[in-house]
């Protein structure tokens, strides 16, 4: 099939926000968490990103494999393949590992891989990851299957709604990977956090959901700050 078309950096599309921040020094290693649901092509993407430049170990305290790899063509970029999970609730060892990695190891960015054929289920984790306020890019995987089934996804509208770059890819066919890396490196280098999405504002500003959410946030704000956790995630 034909390659997946998508605007590259500076070629239009929604997500080209300039934060005004200077880029991180070239000596800084750009570390990325690769996160996503089970069976969404995450391991395939990790292999495409890193090739044979991989190291397999264990996360401390649990029998969960940890895979780290240097991104091909970017010697100063390191990707950690996190276990496949459906939420950030720390109920399983896999969820606990992912939560600890993002909150305690402070990656410079998150690559969230999403199954384009099952977006609704995948976006629950996406929204939780966005609340961590870490620079993030969404890899919309299996777009070749969507295309072959005659479907389409309005990627630019999705970017506008989420406030993060959304890059259509096919990890299995090695399509869109270079663009994904370009966007991931960009948001990490310039520390572009996800756009603030307050979906409880969908109706009136003073709606009940909005009032309840912000009342809770005011109660836990100090505790979240002490724990070093973004208040919306807490």
Enumerate the language-model features and the residues they cover.
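Conserved G1/Walker A P-loop phosphate-binding module
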Residues: 1-92, 103-105, 109
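Residue-level signature of catalytic and energy-coupling elements of molecular machines
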Residues: 33, 45-46, 64, 79-81, ...
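Conserved nucleotide-binding/hydrolysis micro-motifs of P-loop NTPases
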Residues: 52, 61, 84-86, 116-120, ...
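Canonical P-loop GTPase G-domain recognition
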Residues: 144-201
């Amino acid at each position: 099939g034909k390659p997946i078309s998508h605007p590259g950096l500076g070629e239009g599309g929604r997500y080209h926000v300039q934060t005004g921040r200077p880029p991180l020094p070239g000596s800084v290693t750009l570390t990325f968490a690769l996160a996503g649901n089970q069976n969404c092509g995450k391991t395939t993407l990790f292999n495409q990103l890193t090739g044979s430049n991989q190291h397999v170990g264990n996360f401390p305290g649990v029998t969960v494999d940890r895979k780290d790899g240097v991104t091909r063509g970017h010697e100063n970029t390191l990707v950690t393949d996190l276990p496949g999970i459906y939420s950030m609730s720390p109920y399983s060892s896999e969820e606990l590992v992912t939560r600890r990695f993002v909150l305690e190891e402070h990656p410079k960015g998150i690559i969230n891989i999403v199954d384009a054929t099952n977006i609704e289920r995948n976006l629950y984790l996406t929204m939780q990851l966005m609340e961590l306020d870490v620079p993030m890019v969404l890899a919309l995987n299996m777009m070749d299957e969507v295309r072959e089934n005659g479907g389409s996804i309005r990627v630019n509208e999705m970017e506008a709604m989420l406030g993060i770059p959304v890059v259509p890819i096919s990890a299995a066919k090695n399509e869109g990977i270079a663009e994904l890396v370009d966007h991931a490196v960009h948001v990490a280098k310039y520390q572009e956090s996800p756009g603030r999405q307050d979906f409880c504002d969908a109706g009136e500003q003073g709606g009940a959901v909005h009032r309840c959410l912000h009342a809770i946030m005011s109660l836990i704000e100090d505790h979240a700050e002490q724990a070093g956790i973004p208040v919306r995630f807490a």
